[in-house]
Design a protein with these regions (language model features):
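ABC-family P-loop ATPase nucleotide-binding domain
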Residues: 1-12
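ABC transporter nucleotide-binding domains
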Residues: 13-186, 191-205, 211
Length: 212
């Protein structure tokens, strides 16, 4: 039986008395691609933030790779990759400079040059991040999430802004990484993407799981 990479029990988070995540429980096994789905405002991003410990949940328990997300954040940081839609980067920073900055944070980083080649942005290393197209920037953010050489990666709206061909290229790379043992926790709006990649899904509506 595979170990649990993520275990969430009765997670609850509210703002001004309104529940954004309401009594959510889920389990993600090691080596699995898990999809968290829902409309904007359903509680997907807040769920990820509570799992990572960057937001304090009101109640509930969370275990990530056997760690307590808040107490063991430094250890967890070395084993988890996170990709979000946009980052707060210096305006003129170049792709290679940003990759080098991220690389320095980790003990056993992956080869970011190889990752950039694999994701089709190997010829953009000297370009300013802000000069990249939306699709190129999206692929860069996935590369940044993989630089830690993580056991678990969180991918938020994985292929937003990519054309059909680029999306399928990303899917293939993730399938290869999954075969190597990577666990993926992703959010997506695309049902074809979910069908192609996910082993299990949870659908949120107003913070509550309506399908799991």
């Amino acid at each position: 039986m595979r170990e649990e990479a993520i275990k969430v029990t009765n997670l609850r988070k509210s703002y001004n008395g309104k529940a954004v995540v309401d009594n959510l429980s889920l389990s993600v096994k090691t080596g699995m691609v898990f999809g968290l789905l829902g409309a904007n405002g359903a509680g997907k991003s807040t769920t990820i933030e509570c799992i990572l410990g960057t937001k304090q949940a009101d109640s509930g328990e969370v275990s990530v790779l056997g760690y307590h997300a808040k107490k063991d954040r430094r250890k967890l940081f070395q084993e988890v990759g996170v990709q979000f839609q946009e980052g707060d980067y210096q305006p003129e920073i170049k792709v290679f400079e940003l990759c080098e900055e991220i690389e320095c944070l980790y003990k056993n980083p992956a080869d970011w040059r190889q990752l950039c080649e694999r994701f089709g942005i190997g010829d953009k290393l000297k370009n300013a991040v802000k000069s990249l197209s939306g699709g190129e920037r999206q692929r860069l953010f996935i590369v940044l999430a993989l630089i830690p050489n993580p056991k678990l990666v969180f991918l938020d709206e994985l292929t937003t802004g990519l054309d059909a061909r680029a999306r399928r290229t990303v899917w293939k790379i993730l399938e290869d990484l999954k075969k190597q043992g990577l666990t993926v926790f992703m959010t997506s709006h695309f049902m074809d993407e979910v069908e192609a990649l996910c082993d299990e899904i949870c659908i949120l509506k107003k913070g509550e799981p309506v399908f799991y």
